[in-house]
C-alpha cells in the first residue's frame, strides 16, 4: 500500500474524496499569471482615476473636482484611450505579480495544513501575508514605481518618457535601480496586509461555505461574491498605506525622507481625510479585480487538473 502523500495546496476540487483536492504550486503560477493579465485589462481605467486623484494634491491647487471630472477631462484631452495610459507598465507587472502571489500562497500552505489537509483562517492569513510580501519585493514595488512615474509624467506639461522601455531606461539612468524601488517599505506593508486580509476572508468564507465537505464544488458566482467581499475588506483596511505608497513613488517623492515622514506630512498638511483620497474608485476596482482573479484562477486550475496530473 502506498504511503500517504504530504499536503500540498488548495484548489478547486472534485467532490466525493475525503481530503480536499490539492493544487501543485506550478499550476498556481500558471493560473495566477493568466488571471492577473485578464483582470488588469478589465479594471485599469479605475486604477488610472484612483492614481490621478491621489496625486492631485490640494496645494497645487487640485486639478480635478472628483471622479467624474477626472474622467471627463481625460477623455476630452486624450480620448477614451487616455484612461489606459500607463497600462503597459502595469500589465507587465500584473501577470508576474499574480503568479508570484498564488505560487507563494500555495507553497506556504503546503506546510501549514492540518492532518485533514484543511487550511484554517489563521493559517490562511499567515500564508496570505507571506504571499503579499513576496509579490511586493519581487514584482510590485518596481512595477508600481514605474507605473506611477509614467502616469505622473504623461499628465505634466512636457512629458519626457516616449514609451515603457524608454521610460525604464531613463529612470535607471537618472536614479539607478534604486529609482525603481522607491516606497519599498510602504509597498511591503500595503501588499502584505492586502493579501493577509484577502486570503483570511477568502479562506474563512470557503470554510464556512463548504462546512465538513471540503470538496464541495465552488460555483464561480459564489467565488466572485466571496472575492469581492475579501477585496472590500482589504480596501478599508489599508487605503492609507496605498495613499502613502503612491506619494512615495510619484515624481515628487523627493519631498519625503521616508515612509513615516510622508505619512506625517500628509497628516499635517492635508488632514486625516487625505489618507482616504481615491477610496471610491479603488473600492470599485479592487472588488471587481479580486472577484475576477479568484474566479479565473479557480476555473483555470480546474482545467489544469484535467491535463496536468500531479497526484
From Swiss-Prot:
Main localisation: mitochondrion
A Pfam family that the UniProt record links to this protein: Mito_carr
Keywords: Antiport, Membrane, Mitochondrion, Mitochondrion inner membrane, Phosphoprotein, Repeat, Transit peptide, Transmembrane, Transmembrane helix, Transport
Pro-peptide region(s): 1-13
Tissue expression notes: Expressed minimally but ubiquitously throughout the adult brain. Detected at higher levels in the olfactory bulb, neocortex and cerebellum. Also expressed in a subset of large cells in the globus pallidus.
Tagged with keyword Electron transport: no
Protein name per its UniProtKB record: Tricarboxylate transport protein, mitochondrial
Organism encoding this protein: Mus musculus
Gene: Slc25a1
Amino acid at each position: 500500500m502506498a504511503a500517504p502523500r504530504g499536503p500540498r495546496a488548495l484548489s478547486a476540487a472534485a467532490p466525493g474524496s475525503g481530503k480536499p483536492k490539492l493544487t501543485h504550486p506550478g499550476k498556481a503560477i500558471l493560473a495566477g499569471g493568466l488571471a492577473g493579465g485578464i483582470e488588469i485589462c478589465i479594471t485599469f481605467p479605475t486604477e488610472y482615476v484612483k492614481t490621478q486623484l491621489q496625486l492631485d494634491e490640494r496645494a497645487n491647487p487640485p486639478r480635478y473636482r472628483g471622479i467624474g471630472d477626472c474622467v471627463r477631462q481625460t477623455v476630452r484631452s486624450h480620448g477614451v484611450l487616455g484612461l489606459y495610459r500607463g497600462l503597459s507598465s502595469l500589465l507587465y507587472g500584473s501577470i508576474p505579480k499574480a503568479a508570484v502571489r498564488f505560487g507563494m500562497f500555495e507553497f506556504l500552505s503546503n506546510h501549514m495544513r492540518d492532518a485533514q489537509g484543511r487550511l484554517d483562517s489563521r493559517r490562511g492569513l499567515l500564508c496570505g501575508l507571506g504571499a503579499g510580501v513576496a509579490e511586493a519585493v519581487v514584482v510590485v514595488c518596481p512595477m508600481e514605481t514605474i507605473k506611477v512615474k509614467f502616469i505622473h509624467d504623461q499628465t505634466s506639461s512636457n512629458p519626457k518618457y516616449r514609451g515603457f522601455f524608454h521610460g525604464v531606461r531613463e529612470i535607471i539612468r537618472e536614479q539607478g535601480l534604486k529609482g525603481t524601488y522607491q516606497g519599498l517599505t510602504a509597498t511591503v506593508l500595503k501588499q502584505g496586509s492586502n493579501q493577509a486580509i484577502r486570503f483570511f476572508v477568502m479562506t474563512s468564507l470557503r470554510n464556512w461555505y463548504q462546512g465538513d465537505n471540503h470538496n464541495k464544488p465552488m460555483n464561480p458566482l459564489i467565488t466572485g461574491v466571496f472575492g469581492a467581499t475579501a477585496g472590500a475588506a482589504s480596501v478599508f483596511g489599508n487605503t492609507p498605506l496605498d495613499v502613502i505608497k503612491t506619494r512615495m513613488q510619484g515624481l515628487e517623492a523627493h519631498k519625503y525622507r521616508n515612509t513615516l515622514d510622508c505619512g506625517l506630512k500628509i497628516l499635517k498638511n492635508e488632514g486625516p481625510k487625505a489618507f482616504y483620497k481615491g477610496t471610491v474608485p479603488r473600492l470599485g476596482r479592487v472588488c471587481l479585480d479580486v472577484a475576477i482573479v479568484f474566479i479565473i484562477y479557480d476555473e483555470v486550475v480546474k482545467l489544469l487538473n484535467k491535463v496536468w496530473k500531479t497526484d
